[in-house]
Amino acid sequence: MPEAVIGLDVGKLSHWACVATRDGEILLSAPVANREGDLDSLFGRFPDALVVVDQSRNIGALALARARAAGMSAAYLPGLAAHGAARLFAGDAKTD
């Protein structure tokens, strides 16, 4: 089981990265450019984390490819699951 999860809300030019530990501690919550070097830098900071994206094709493909190239476990969170998870939090729950 990974020590942390890197959740990426993927976008065309940049993604929002949130890194959380198993205990729920947020280690990072910041944008990361959708470029190989920027993604590699993020993944290099947390090499043992599980990478999860909310879109696996097109704009999410580079993030998945770079995570796998770094030897990291990577997964896709389908839309219905993301929507269900967003409902767990109070306030505005926006899902793509």
Whereabouts are the PLM-identified features?
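Phosphate- and other anionic-substrate recognition elements at nucleic-acid/protein interfaces
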Residues: 1-96
